[in-house]
Amino acid sequence: MESIRVATWNIHKGVNGIGPRGRLEIHNIGLAIDQFDADIICLQEVRKAHSKHAARFERWPDQEQADFLAPLGYTPIYQTNAITKHGEHGNALLTRWPVLSQRHEDMSDHRFEQRGLLHVEMVIH
């Protein structure tokens, strides 16, 4: 039986810390993901966009974080869980295999903590 390598990581929107002490970590996260050699990588708290962080951090990627973090040859799938004043964030899946379908299900129990489930169907070979 062949094995499948799966990794999961809450990347905390690519920033370590909050406020003026926050540090941009998205580039380090990308380097770590490249080292995983996982077939499927599930990511939580992934930014699609954030205008304040883009203005504050000189090296903020021009791409959405899921696209930026996807190793060469991987397909990034992203769905938004929360839309805020300055941007949005959600869940992402990076996969080596072809994606058949994807959907998002809102799992929020109230409007102040938006949660979502990313469901992806793929062909594994």
Where are these regions (language model features)?
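Conserved beta strand-loop-helix elements of the APE1-like EEP
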Residues: 71-73, 86-102, 123
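Active-site catalytic loop in hydrolytic enzyme cores
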Residues: 97-125
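Conserved hydrophobic/aromatic beta-strand scaffold that supports enzyme active sites
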Residues: 8, 91-93, 117-121
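Active-site/binding-pocket entry motifs
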Residues: 12-14, 75, 100
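N-terminal, active-site-proximal structural segment of metallo-dependent hydrolase catalytic domains
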Residues: 1-71, 83-88
